[in-house]
From Swiss-Prot:
This is tRNA N6-adenosine threonylcarbamoyltransferase. Its EC number is 2.3.1.234. Belongs to the KAE1 / TsaD family. Binds 1 Fe(2+) ion per subunit.
Length: 347
């Protein structure tokens, strides 16, 4: 069964093709991605209207590229999947519209996929895929959550951010330091030259006794420190970047370890854009190795938004019998969409 996946939730256009035949994890046949980072740099952030227009320009050429790389034709596709949400409404509508139009033209079923489920399952495409059950740390620009995952479609929310996401803390702190967009990777690069102990920054909710996160206070502390430094900021920027990164990573690592202790599980999956952060990987690996915990990540090029994770999630849901294939081509998107029902929140 060939599944074509389309991702267009924010500022990356991704298309991929997987083979979900049989009971094995779907096999990635080909994928292509176009990032809009350069276009949005001039504005210091994502401009939704520009993002939508660029998705329109890119999605069909990327689809043709993916099919050519896989040596398959569109007529051979069995299911067309797309990101239904969460994300930017206009951007989501582009992917949904193209997916439904393609499926209708081909007479094939169409399927909406949850963006976060794609991230959560993306490590199954790695050379070291996880095994159920596991704890997942979903950490990106828009989300920071800890979940217990027993199988495909069974997700229990353990904790989440009550304000800013970790990726947002990276990006906003970088902006306060005058670093270019996207701020997170630039801050991480600069931090390599700095001393993470040079500034004492808060670790919000670190000792709260639950698994929730908060990063708004850290952002405020970075702003206060930047103002305090004044003209000296330029000379101390690397130290402030290192201290900021250390604070964010410290919270993510300790909360993840607390989740592992609470659940008693021995496998941790880290997914989302921030999962590519080298310091986070290093500290998690070291801490988990001491505790006999296996850590699984997506391949680095699949940490950010991509079509492969959408095609994979669709394929895995179909294999698990969680979807009934539909040929109705009216569609709606869900810019706000929780992956876990409220009642699934652990006490």
């Amino acid at each position: 069964m060939l599944v074509l996946g389309i991702e267009s939730s924010c500022d990356e256009t991704g298309v991929a093709l997987v083979d979900a035949g049989g009971s094995e994890v779907p096999r990635l046949l080909s994928h292509a991605l176009f990032s809009q980072i350069q276009m949005h740099q001039a504005y210091g952030g994502v401009v939704p209207e520009l993002a939508s227009r660029d998705h329109i320009r890119r999605v069909l050429p990327l689809t043709r590229q993916v099919m050519a790389q896989a040596g398959r034709s569109l007529a051979q596709v069995d299911v067309v999947a797309y990101t239904r949400g969460p994300g930017l409404a206009g951007a989501l509508l582009v992917g949904a519209g193209v997916a439904c139009a393609l499926a209708a033209a081909l007479g094939k079923p169409v399927m909406g996929v949850h963006h976060l489920e794609g991230h959560l399952l993306s490590p199954f495409l790695s050379a070291d895929p996880p095994v159920f059950p596991f704890v997942a740390l979903l950490v990106s620009g828009g989300h920071t959550q800890l979940m217990r995952v027993d199988r495909v479609g069974s997700y229990e929310l353990l904790g989440e951010t009550i304000d800013d996401a970790a990726g947002e803390a990276f990006d906003k702190s970088a902006k306060l330091m005058g670093l270019p967009y996207p701020g997170g990777p630039h801050l991480a690069d600069l931090a390599r030259q700095g001393d993470g102990t040079a500034f004492k920054l808060p670790r919000p909710l670190l000792h709260s006794g639950d698994l929730d996160f908060s990063f708004a206070g850290l952002k405020t502390a970075v702003l206060t420190q930047a103002k305090k430094l004044g003209p000296e900021l330029e000379n101390r920027k690397a130290d402030l970047a290192a201290a900021t990164q250390a604070a964010i990573v410290d919270v993510l690592v300790k909360k993840s370890l607390a989740a592992m202790a609470q659940t008693g599980l021995k496998r941790l999956v880290v997914a989302g854009g921030v999962g590519a952060n080298a310091l986070l990987r290093s500290q998690l690996n070291a801490a988990c190795q001491q505790r006999g915990i296996r850590v699984h990540y997506p391949e680095l090029h699949l940490c950010t938004d991509n079509g492969a994770m959408i095609a994979l999630a669709a394929g895995m849901r179909l294999q698990a019998g969680l979807e009934t294939l539909q040929r109705g081509y009216t569609f709606d998107v869900k810019p706000r969409w929780s992956l876990t029902p409220t009642v699934a929140r652990s006490a």
